[in-house]
Every structure is written in structure tokens, then in C-alpha cells.
From Swiss-Prot:
Protein name per its UniProtKB record: Gas vesicle protein F
Gene encoding the protein: gvpF
InterPro entries attached to this UniProt entry: GvpL/GvpF
Species whose genome carries this gene: Haloferax mediterranei (strain ATCC 33500 / DSM 1411 / JCM 8866 / NBRC 14739 / NCIMB 2177 / R-4)
Oligomeric form and interacting partners: Binds GvpA.
GO term, biological process aspect, one: gas vesicle organization
Additional information: Encoded in a 14-gene locus called mc-vac.
Its biological purpose: A minor component of the gas vesicle, may be involved in preventing GvpA aggregation during gas vesicle nucleation. Gas vesicles are hollow, gas filled proteinaceous nanostructures found in some microorganisms. They allow positioning of halobacteria at the optimal depth for growth in the poorly aerated, shallow brine pools of their habitat.
Keywords from the named record: Gas vesicle
Localization in the cell: Gas vesicle
One cellular component term from this protein's GO annotations in UniProt: gas vesicle
Amino acid sequence: MSDNLYTYGVIEQEDIELEIDGVAGAERVYTVDYRTLSAVVSDIDTTDPERTDEDVQVHNTVLQHVLEYDGGRTVVPMSFGMAFKNGRTLKGVMRGARRALRSALNDIEGTVELGVKIITSSEGGVSHDAIRADIGDRLSELSINETENDLFSDRLVVNKSYLVARDRRDDFDAAIDTIEEEYGDELTVQYTGPWAPYNFVDIHIGADQQRGR
């Protein structure tokens, strides 16, 4: 049996075991500890997993389970494909990245990421700048941080990720509901999450580190 470990993210030290599907057909998800940190992992037979739509969805679903575990956990997410040769290699990477991981956990403690796309019903009508200003003001005051994502369509006027404290989540939800009610058919709101805060952490792990080189 392979000792390879697929890694979803890092949390404060805690023993967690989830009987849920993992990437590449894994049947359970559990934690590997290094000092005050725990990596959320599952077993895998390779250090170079194939990226499929199904497994990307599984990766995100596992992170959502951790986010919601026993009232909610703060998690520093790893990008898809972070698989390590064995537990020793993983712990070595955690040791080297400990300060960055600790800083990231502190920065996002008690938060989730929420995605908001606003699409106009036509290219005419309400000013796009006015929509951006109005919605931006409403949502910015309910969030800790935000990032701008690509506006890949002329009708896409807002595409942002928001870092929101868990205790402001209901307020943020209510603001989205109000926006939908007030703008009616003029806008379509695509509201997603909660997600692990991918857009608000910046930790890089190279292929050589994954393979223990």
C-alpha cells in the first residue's frame, strides 16, 4: 500500500476523521499533525494526481466539510494536486512553511470566502458603474477583505470574492437578498460559498517539496 498523502488544507491542531469520499477514490479523510498544525489528508497512490472535474469537486467538498465540522473550522486551503510522498515529507514541508501557515491561519481565523457575480439582463439600462458602486459599498462594509476577479463578459459587472467573518454571514446573506429584491429582473446574482479562503492566502509549495527532494 502506498504511503502517499493527498492534502486538502491545514487547520489548527486537531484529530479529525471523516468517513467521506476523498480524491482518487479515497474512503476517508483524516489529519496528520505537526506541532500546533494539522494537515487534512487522504491516502492516494500517486504524488501526481490527474486533475478531473470530479476530483476537483471532491477536493472542494472535503474542504467544505472541514469548514462546517463541529460548528466550523478555519482552514488554509491547498490548491488541487498537493500530494506528498509520505507523512515524513508532509511534516517536513509543514515545518518549513510553519510561519507562513500560522500567519495565514491568524489572518483568516473565523472566516469563510463567498463569491458574488452580478450579471445585467442587457447591455443597456442601469449604469454599470452605478451598480458596481452601490453593490460594492453594501458588501464591502460587511466583509473583512475582497478581491476582484476577471470580468469575462460585457454583461458581468461584478465578479468578486469576499472574506467574511462567520458571525457576519447572516448579514451578508441578507444583503444579497436585498440586492436581488431591489434590482429585480435588471440583474442576475450568482452567490456561491462558503468556500475555504483560496483568494486570501498565498502559500506556495513546489513539486520537489511534494516528492521529498
